[in-house]
C-alpha cells in the first residue's frame, strides 16, 4: 500500500513535543517525578472488562450476539495487546437458550446459540461476565412459583455442567456469574419478580452453580444501591445473603462471592469513585460480614445512555477520561490503605455496536460503518482511541512505582488535569528482563480544549542497570490520532471508500517514536507539551536474553472484495517490549513479501491493498525494540470468493 502521510513529519512533530521546552507557557509546568527504584505495592489490572446489551426484542438476542458485526467487534475487543480486555459482561444470555417440554412432563434445553456465543468469546480469548438473565423461551415467568424455582436451579446447574465439560473447570471457574442486571429497574420483560421471587431466584442460581462445582463464583445485584428505602431489591438481596434463610437448604445466610454495583459519572471522573465510597460505607455499616467481600463496579461509565451521541465519546477525550478514572481508583482508593475497601473490578459498558448517523459518537470501542453501496453490502469497523488506550494500559505491569505530579511546588492528586500511573516488572528468571511503563494523562473530563497545551516535565530516575536499555514513547491526541477527526475532514462520508478507510485507519495507533538508548545514570528527562486531552506512554526496557516468542492463532476474516482482517494472539510472544508486528503475504504460498504499514502492536490488521489482490497466504511475527524478530506464525491461507457482476445495491444508511 502507499504511505498514507509522511511518517517523518509525524515523528518530527512528536520529537518536538517531547524534547522542546514549551514556548511561553501560560501556567507553570506540571512536574512528573517517577522513581523506578521505589516499588510501592502490587498493581492489579482491575479494569480489563467491557460489556453490552442486545437490543429489543431480547427474545431475538441471538441475531445480535451472533451477527457478523458482533463477531468483528469481539475480534477487535480480543485483539487488545496482552489481554488488555479479558471480560465481556453480557445481558440476556439465557434468551439464547430454547426450552422444550413443559412443567410436569419434563424440560429439556437447546444451548446451540449460547454455545455459539461462548465459543466466539473463547476464540477471541475473552471470558463472559455471565449474567443469569432471561426467561429461556418465555418458560420462566414467576419465581414465587416453587416449581419454577426448582426448574431454574436445574437449568443453571445444567448449563454450568455443560460448559465445565466443554471448556474445563479451570476456565469456567474464571467466569463472573452474576444476577439479573439492575433488578430495581424492573427490566424483567415478561417475568414477574417480587422481592421474595428475586430472593428465590438468587438461591436457585447459587445452588445450581454449587451443584455443578463449588469453585464457581456468583455475585450481584449489579444495580445503583440508592440510599434505603430506595433500591429495595438490591438491599434486600444483601440482607438475605447476610442473615436470611436459604430457600433450598434452610440454612442462615447465602453465599455472595462479590457485590456488584453500578455508579456512573454524570460527565465527572471523580464522581464515580466518590459514589462508590458512599455505597461501600453503607454496606459496611449495614452488613459487617461483607466488609471483606470484593466490590465490582461493572458499569462505571462516565455517562449513562450508551446510544446518546456525544462528541467527546468519539475521540481522545473519552480515552483520556477512562485512563483518568482508572488512575483515580488506583491512586486514591487502592493505594490508600487508610480508606481502601476491597475494590476488585471496574468495567466500562462500551462493547456496543454504533449505528448511523453516529459511527463514532456513541459509547463504543469501535466505530461501525454499514457500507451499503457495495455488492453485497458489508460492515467496516474502526478502532476508536478508547480501545487504543486499553492497549496502553495493558503495558502497565504488576508493581506500582512511586510517582508524583506537582505544579508550582504543590503536589496534585489524581483529581486534576494531569495525572500518572507508573509500574515496573521485575525479572522472573534469566531469560526475563526489567521494564517500566509511565502513563501520563492530560484530561479535563468530557471537555476538550483544541487550542490548549499543558507543559509537562517528566523526570524518571532509579532505572537499574541492564543490557540494552532503551525507551519508547507512544502519544495520542486529537490532532494526530483521531479516526473521527479524519472522517470529519473527509466530509463525514456515509459510505467511505477503501482509500478513505485507509486514511481513517492511519490515525488509529499512537504516534510512536523509535527506540532510543536510555541516558547514562538511569535517569530520563522529557519535556512534552501535551495537548488537552492526550495520553503519553513512556516505556523503558532492558533487552531480554531472547527475541519474542511465536505469534499464534492467526485468522483471516473477510471484509469485502479486496479486503480482509487478520487477527492473532500474543499469548506466547512473551515480551511487552514490542515495536511492531511484521505481516507478510504470498500469492503462491512460497515467496513472501512484507506488507507495508505503520508500526503497530495491536493484534489485528485490516489488509486493503490498492491492487485488491488478497487471495494467498499470510504469516505474522513480532519485532522487539532491538529489531529482533520472533518466529513467524503458522501461515494461514485465504481464498477470496468472487462476487457475481452487477450494479451495487444503493441501500440506505
Curated annotation (Swiss-Prot):
Post-translational modifications: N-glycosylation at Asn-372 contributes to substrate binding and is required for full enzymatic activity.
Catalytic residues as annotated in Swiss-Prot or TrEMBL: 182, 299
Subcellular location: Lysosome
Subunit structure: Monomer.
Effect annotated for changing residue 602 to I: In MPS1H/S; reduction of activity and protein levels
Gene name tied to this protein: IDUA
An individual GO BP term: disaccharide metabolic process
Tissue specificity of this protein: Ubiquitous.
Protein name: Alpha-L-iduronidase
Signal peptide: 1-27
Record note on what altering residue 490 to P does: In MPS1H/S and MPS1S
Enzyme Commission designation: 3.2.1.76
Principal subcellular localisation of the protein: other
Effect caused by changing residue 103 to P: In MPS1H; uncertain significance
Keyword Lyase belongs to the record: no
Glycosylation positions in this chain: 110, 190, 336, 372, 415, 451
GO cellular component: extracellular exosome; lysosomal lumen
Effect caused by changing residue 327 to P: In MPS1H; MPS1H/S
Superkingdom: Eukaryota
SS bond list: 541-577
Disease: Mucopolysaccharidosis 1H: A severe form of mucopolysaccharidosis type 1, a rare lysosomal storage disease characterized by progressive physical deterioration with urinary excretion of dermatan sulfate and heparan sulfate. Patients with MPS1H usually present, within the first year of life, a combination of hepatosplenomegaly, skeletal deformities, corneal clouding and severe intellectual disability. Obstructive airways disease, respiratory infection and cardiac complications usually result in death before 10 years of age. Mucopolysaccharidosis 1H/S: A form of mucopolysaccharidosis type 1, a rare lysosomal storage disease characterized by progressive physical deterioration with urinary excretion of dermatan sulfate and heparan sulfate. MPS1H/S represents an intermediate phenotype of the MPS1 clinical spectrum. It is characterized by relatively little neurological involvement, but most of the somatic symptoms described for severe MPS1 develop in the early to mid-teens, causing considerable loss of mobility.
Amino acid at each position: 500500500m502507499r504511505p498514507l502521510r509522511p511518517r517523518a513529519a509525524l515523528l518530527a512533530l512528536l520529537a518536538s513535543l517531547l524534547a522542546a521546552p514549551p514556548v511561553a507557557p501560560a501556567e507553570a509546568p506540571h512536574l512528573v517525578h517517577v522513581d523506578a527504584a521505589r516499588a510501592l505495592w502490587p498493581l492489579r489490572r482491575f479494569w480489563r472488562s467491557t460489556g453490552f446489551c442486545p437490543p429489543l426484542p431480547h427474545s431475538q438476542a441471538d441475531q445480535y450476539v451472533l451477527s457478523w458485526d458482533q463477531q468483528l467487534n469481539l475480534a477487535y475487543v480480543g485483539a487488545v495487546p496482552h489481554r488488555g480486555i479479558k471480560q465481556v459482561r453480557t445481558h440476556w444470555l439465557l434468551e439464547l437458550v430454547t426450552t422444550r417440554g413443559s412443567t410436569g412432563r419434563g424440560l429439556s434445553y437447546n444451548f446451540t446459540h449460547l454455545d455459539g456465543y461462548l465459543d466466539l468469546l473463547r476464540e477471541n480469548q475473552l471470558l463472559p461476565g455471565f449474567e443469569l438473565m432471561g426467561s429461556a423461551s418465555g418458560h420462566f415467568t414467576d419465581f414465587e412459583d416453587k416449581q419454577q424455582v426448582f426448574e431454574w436451579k436445574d437449568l443453571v446447574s445444567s448449563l454450568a455442567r455443560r460448559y465445565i465439560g466443554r471448556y474445563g473447570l479451570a476456565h469456567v471457574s474464571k467466569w463472573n456469574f452474576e444476577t439479573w442486571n439492575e433488578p430495581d429497574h424492573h427490566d424483567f420483560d415478561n417475568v414477574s419478580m417480587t422481592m421474595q421471587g428475586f430472593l428465590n431466584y438468587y438461591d436457585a442460581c447459587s445452588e445450581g452453580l454449587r451443584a455443578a462445582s463449588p469453585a464457581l463464583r456468583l455475585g450481584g445485584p449489579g444495580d445503583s444501591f440508592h440510599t434505603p428505602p430506595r433500591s429495595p431489591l438490591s438491599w434486600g438481596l444483601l440482607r438475605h445473603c447476610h442473615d436470611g434463610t436459604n430457600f433450598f437448604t434452610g440454612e442462615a445466610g447465602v453465599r455472595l462471592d462479590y457485590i456488584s454495583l453500578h455508579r456512573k459519572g454524570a460527565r465527572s471522573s471523580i464522581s464515580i469513585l466518590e459514589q462508590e465510597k458512599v455505597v461501600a460505607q453503607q454496606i459496611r455499616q449495614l452488613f459487617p460480614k461483607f466488609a471483606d467481600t470484593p466490590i465490582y463496579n461493572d458499569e462505571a461509565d462516565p455517562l449513562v445512555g450508551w446510544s446518546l451521541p456525544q462528541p467527546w465519546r468519539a475521540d481522545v477525550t473519552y480515552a483520556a477520561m477512562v485512563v483518568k478514572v482508572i488512575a483515580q481508583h488506583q491512586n486514591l482508593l487502592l493505594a490508600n490503605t487508610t480508606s481502601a475497601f476491597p475494590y476488585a473490578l471496574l468495567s466500562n459498558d462500551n462493547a456496543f455496536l454504533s449505528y448511523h448517523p453516529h459511527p463514532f459518537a456513541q459509547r463504543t470501542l469501535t466505530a461501525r460503518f454499514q457500507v451499503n453501496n457495495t455488492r453485497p453490502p458489508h460492515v467496516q469497523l474502526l478502532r476508536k482511541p478508547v480501545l487504543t488506550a486499553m492497549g496502553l494500559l495493558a503495558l502497565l505491569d504488576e508493581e506500582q512505582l512511586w510517582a508524583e505530579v506537582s505544579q508550582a511546588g504543590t503536589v496534585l492528586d489524581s483529581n486534576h488535569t494531569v495525572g500518572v500511573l507508573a509500574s515496573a516488572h521485575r525479572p522472573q528468571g534469566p531469560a526475563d528482563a526489567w521494564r517500566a511503563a509511565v502513563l501520563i494523562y492530560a484530561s479535563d473530563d468530557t471537555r476538550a480544549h483544541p487550542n490548549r497545551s499543558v507543559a509537562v516535565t517528566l523526570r524518571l530516575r532509579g532505572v537499574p542497570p541492564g543490557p540494552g536499555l532503551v525507551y519508547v514513547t507512544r502519544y495520542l491526541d486529537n490532532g494526530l490520532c483521531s479516526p473521527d477527526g479524519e472522517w470529519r475532514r473527509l466530509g463525514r462520508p456515509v459510505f467511505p471508500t477503501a482509500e478513505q478507510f485507509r486514511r481513517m485507519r492511519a490515525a488509529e495507533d499512537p504516534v510512536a517514536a523509535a527506540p532510543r538508548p536510555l541516558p547514562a545514570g538511569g535517569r530520563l528527562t522529557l519535556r512534552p507539551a501535551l495537548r488537552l486531552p492526550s495520553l503519553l506512554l513512556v516505556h523503558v526496557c532492558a533487552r531480554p536474553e531472547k527475541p519474542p516468542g511465536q505469534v499464534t492463532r492467526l485468522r483471516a476474516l473477510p471484509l469485502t472484495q479486496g479486503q480482509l482482517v487478520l487477527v492473532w494472539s500474543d499469548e506466547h510472544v512473551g515480551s511487552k517490549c514490542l515495536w511492531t508486528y511484521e505481516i507478510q503475504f504470498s500469492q503462491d504460498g512460497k515467496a513472501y513479501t512484507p506488507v507495508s504499514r505503520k508500526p503497530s502492536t495491536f493484534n489485528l490488521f485490516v489488509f486493503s491493498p490498492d491492487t485488491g489482490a488478497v487471495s494467498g497466504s499470510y504469516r505474522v511475527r513480532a519485532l522487539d525494540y532491538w529489531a529482533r524478530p520472533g518466529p513467524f506464525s503458522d501461515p494461514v491461507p485465504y481464498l477470496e470468493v468472487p462476487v457475481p457482476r452487477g450494479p451495487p445495491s444503493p441501500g440506505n444508511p
